[in-house]
């Protein structure tokens, strides 16, 4: 419901086609077969992130960041949205100072987002009756070897060749190297995209 409400509204604010956004972002096979059919908690995470971004576009940053913070508590990958919200909040703060002091506005926006995110995560942790032990389990997904994941594909291709060089090399070793390489590339790509789309709120959402 959150996704159905927020995705067309975001498209409308960005000057896009809400109907097309509904078909591509909501009524698609991945949504029905993976998120809904698989009963994944990503569906709630995506809904909260979309709602948070919509509220950020409407300048309701306190609630928007809080929703994304709750999404981070559900699935850590939601944190990817936060750096882009920082750009939006920075411009909002700088506008209060007649469009000046962007460096200070950037620092304040970053602190705002970081503190509110931690508060949201803390509240969710306390209300759920959990301890902070869940933080140590964030790397638990690394124990799962998904053949559809790109690092696993690279490891499957590279391992036979690596064995010719050293018989002691195992698939898990190659997979570990591939995962590190892919993580570095993904982080670098995120930084490039984050910096590239910093100029307007519309760019940040895109």
Language model features with spans:
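Aromatic/glycine/proline-enriched transmembrane-helix motif characteristic
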Residues: 4, 13, 137-206
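Hydrophobic transmembrane alpha-helices
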Residues: 4-8, 12, 33, 49-58, ...
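Transmembrane-helix signature of polytopic, membrane-embedded enzymes
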Residues: 7-29, 202-205
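Aromatic- and kink-enriched transmembrane "portal" helix at the membrane-lumen/periplasm boundary
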Residues: 23-46
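Membrane-interface alpha helices of multi-pass inner-membrane proteins
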Residues: 32-35, 51-55, 61-85
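Specific aromatic-rich, kink-prone transmembrane helix
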Residues: 44-60, 188-195
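Perimembrane helix-loop-helix junctions
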Residues: 81-115
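Transmembrane-lumen/periplasm boundary regions of multi-pass, lipid-linked membrane glycan transferases
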Residues: 115-140, 159
């Amino acid at each position: 419901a959150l996704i159905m409400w927020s995705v067309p509204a975001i498209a409308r604010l960005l000057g896009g086609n809400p109907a097309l956004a509904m078909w591509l972002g909501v009524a698609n096979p991945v949504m029905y077969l993976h998120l809904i059919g698989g009963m994944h908690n990503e569906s709630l995470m995506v809904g909260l992130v979309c709602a948070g971004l919509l509220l950020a576009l409407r300048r309701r940053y306190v609630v928007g960041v809080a929703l994304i913070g709750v999404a981070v508590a559900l699935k850590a990958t939601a944190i990817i949205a936060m750096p882009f919200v920082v750009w939006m909040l920075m411009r909002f703060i700088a506008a209060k100072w007649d469009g000046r002091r962007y460096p200070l506005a950037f620092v304040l926006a970053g602190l705002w987002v970081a503190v509110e995110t931690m508060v949201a995560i803390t509240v969710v942790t306390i209300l759920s009756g959990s301890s902070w032990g869940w933080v140590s389990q964030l790397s638990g997904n690394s124990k799962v070897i998904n053949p559809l994941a790109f690092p696993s594909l690279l490891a499957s291709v590279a391992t036979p060749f690596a064995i010719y060089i050293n018989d002691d090399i195992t698939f898990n070793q190659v997979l570990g190297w591939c995962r590190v390489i892919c993580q570095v590339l993904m982080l670098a790509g995120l930084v490039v995209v984050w910096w590239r789309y910093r100029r307007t709120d519309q760019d940040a959402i895109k």
